[in-house]
Amino acid sequence: MAAEHLIRFAAGRSKIRVWDAGCARGQETWSLAMILAERMNQYGFRNLKIDATDHDSQNHFGAVVTQGTYSFRELERTPRHLVERYFRTLYDGGREFCQVIELLRQKVTYHYHDLLSLRPVGGNYCLILCKNVLLHLQYEERVAVYRMFHEALTPGGYLATEQTQKLPPEVAHLFEKAVPDAQLFKRVEQLAGRLNQQSVNTISGGTER
């Protein structure tokens, strides 16, 4: 669902940036990359860049995501036709495993990143994914991270979170629901609201004088 909204939103853009915040071993990152490779036109996919990040102090995930290597068991839930199209089979010391093809690997960059730094890894993202991370944060931390995501999104960009994670009321004015049955939100711009409030204040001030 997030991919379909991204494709429509990003049509004609020269830069299409996606941030997978909390990518773990990268399965979600590559699933999204495969979906976009299947459904985007050639121009759009050429302009796609995905930042995959995780707070992985033991560096368990970086090499896995960068190399895109997985066992067949890890890909059991991936549709067979996608595995055949976007993975190649490799052998190492009698061990058989799969590697994401170069076409997709060149679209993804892994970064070590702590969401609680409240410093975005980049900016002007058309889509930010954050699944199975926010639920581990304290309430005040979640509010701060949502504000950071709003800052990192391009105007009108999308934020997708886990289905069980509700938007805190403190940041409800920063996002609007894109669909009724999923946690997919669209960035709301604040400029118009500020200008309207300034106009109200000016009118009120003039009346009092």
Segments from the language model and where they lie:
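Extended basic-aromatic, gly/pro-enriched interface segments that bind polyanionic ligands
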Residues: 43-129, 133-136, 141, 167
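Conserved SAM-binding loop of SAM-dependent methyltransferases across substrates and taxa
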Residues: 25-43
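Conserved class I S-adenosyl-L-methionine
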Residues: 14-31, 49-51
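A structural alpha-helix within SAM-dependent methyltransferase catalytic domains
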Residues: 3, 33-37, 150
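A short glycine-rich, Lys/Arg-flanked "PGG" loop and its adjoining helix->strand segment in the class I
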Residues: 143-155
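Active-site micro-motifs of SAM-dependent methyltransferase domains
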Residues: 4, 8, 38, 117, ...
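Class I (Rossmann-like) S-adenosyl-L-methionine-dependent methyltransferase catalytic domain
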Residues: 56-61, 86-90, 96-102, 112-122, ...
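Conserved AdoMet
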Residues: 1-19
